């Protein structure tokens, strides 16, 4: 039953995303949410607001830039992976290319981005050594053989209806984490690999599943289930956990898709009733791409003057669409609360023990 429930939920999500007009306006938020939660599993401490503020160019010193860059790099890796699937199958070459994007700057950029490891690594709490590690991935020769076998499994089972896609995803994720082929970034790559498999297969036309929400909420169990697979071969328990995560997050993402569509229709109606111009309608749509803005961004985004941008901001404030959040008299920053709040649900905060880097 867990498989049937997860498959049905995923189908609903794909259908819900297909029914959203101009779905490309909203994909960035789904991608950023997955990037944020996947990075938080590894200990990154920032929020969706921090990401969009950084991308706006208005980042402050209150949040370490290295944490924000880690998520921004994940977004770049995510987008790169989905784009490259059009021309390259999932395999060693694509994984290395995506990894190079993931660790292109900041934390981990000194850990051989884009290269499989040439030395032994291990999994354990911060400060652990090879002698005290909770798990030691295969040495280099065996690692290469295991990667070859994993790639063969991905390709051979793609056309085999006897093994359901979601079971394949769960098996591939756990095996990739066990192989741990990179010096850093394995956890994030393993979770991204699930989305890549779903999109490559056509089960998801758009990358709108944020599985890391579930994995973050159940982080200790997530790590424990993976450990049980490695140590005791507890594959069935792992797959049951994994499928429950697919079902829960797919249903949540479907609800969010419906809420996004309803919000857009409601706000467009409100702006039209208030006599909004075509440029203001254009700005409203752009806010789904960048929900934290300033006057300078608006001027550039819809090619208007500074006075016009200020007038649009006042109108959107009056309609309860934009809210000033900087508290400054100059260089003010505005937040699209109703949209961000659909995705910016509270989480348990940064990690503090074992990581799957």
Mark where each language-model region is.
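FIC/Doc superfamily catalytic core
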Residues: 1-357
């Amino acid at each position: 039953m867990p498989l049937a429930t997860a498959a049905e939920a995923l189908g609903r999500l794909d259908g819900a995303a297909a029914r959203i007009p101009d779905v490309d306006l909203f994909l960035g938020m789904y991608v950023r949410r997955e990037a944020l939660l996947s990075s938080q599993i590894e200990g990154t401490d920032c929020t969706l607001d921090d990401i969009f503020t950084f991308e706006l160019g208005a980042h402050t010193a209150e949040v370490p830039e290295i944490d924000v860059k880690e998520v921004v790099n994940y977004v770049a890796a995510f987008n790169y992976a989905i784009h490259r699937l059009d021309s390259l199958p999932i395999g060693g070459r694509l994984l290395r290319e995506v990894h190079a994007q993931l660790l292109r700057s900041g934390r981990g950029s000194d850990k051989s981005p884009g290269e499989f490891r040439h030395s032994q690594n291990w999994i354990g709490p911060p400060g652990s050594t090879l002698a005290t590690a909770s798990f030691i991935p295969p040495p280099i020769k065996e690692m290469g053989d295991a990667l070859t076998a994993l790639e063969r499994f991905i390709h051979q089972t793609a056309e085999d209806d006897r093994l359901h896609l979601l079971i394949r995803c769960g098996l591939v994720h756990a095996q990739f984490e066990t192989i741990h082929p990179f010096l850093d970034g394995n956890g994030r790559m393993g979770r991204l690999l699930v989305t890549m498999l779903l999109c490559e297969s056509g089960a998801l036309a758009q990358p709108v599943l944020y599985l890391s929400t579930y994995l973050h909420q159940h982080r200790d169990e997530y790590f424990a289930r993976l450990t049980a697979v490695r140590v005791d071969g507890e594959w069935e328990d792992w797959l049951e956990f994994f499928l429950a995560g697919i079902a829960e997050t797919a249903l949540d993402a479907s609800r969010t898709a419906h809420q996004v569509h309803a919000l857009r229709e409601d706000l467009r109606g409100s702006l039209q009733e208030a006599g909004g111009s075509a440029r203001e309608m254009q700005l409203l749509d752009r806010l789904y791409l960048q929900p934290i803005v300033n006057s300078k961004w608006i001027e550039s985004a819809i090619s208007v003057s500074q006075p016009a941008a200020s007038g649009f901001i006042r109108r959107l404030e009056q309609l309860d669409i934009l809210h000033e959040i900087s508290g400054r008299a100059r260089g003010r920053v505005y937040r699209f609360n109703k949209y961000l709040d659909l995705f910016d649900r509270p989480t348990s905060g940064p990690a503090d023990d074992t990581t799957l880097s």
